[in-house]
Amino acid sequence: KFMHGDLGRYWYSTSPSLNRMAADRAGQLEEALVLVEIDKALGKYINSIGDRGHFETVQVAPDGSGEVPDDPGGVRAVVLGVDHPHNGRDGSDAMAECKDILLQRGNTPRVYRNTLVFIAADNRQLESLKDAMRAALAWTGIMRDTDNGRLDLKSSDIALSKDKAKEAQDTVSTRLKETWAYLIYPYGQGKQKARQ
């Protein structure tokens, strides 16, 4: 049995509260799905930015060095995906991916190494972003199930679900901006030098 409350009234029911339902759904989501959705949200956010500044192009979450072109046409920003976070040290996943992309394009050596800069996620902020994405996916799923008729909610619960879904999406947007905080760029004469 579950305890419910509304406007100072409390009662027991055999169905879980809306918040409990969302928390259960969020807890059941697979990590891989959450990471894919974070990369999608990152791409959507980056592509919505109109002003690219001094960057000729911005590439989001490439699957490998082969997806990053090697041309002289200006500075390219490579926004590393969620699989390559940075922890402020040389041995991070982000630094390994940056070195791989800087040294080669696919199987061929990269010629225009000095035209690339990288933006990477802060490893410490990533967990809070994952939690926010789980909540957003859970509330969106509740809304979808309500619209499809698979979930029968009261009108007050529908309004609450819409508010919670919007709030969760806003939290994801905020956390995306907070998480991608590292700028990594090549410098010096050596092939593998990079500065963060």
What is the predicted function of each stretch?
Residues K1-Q196:
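Extended alpha-helical scaffold and adjacent linker segments that couple domains
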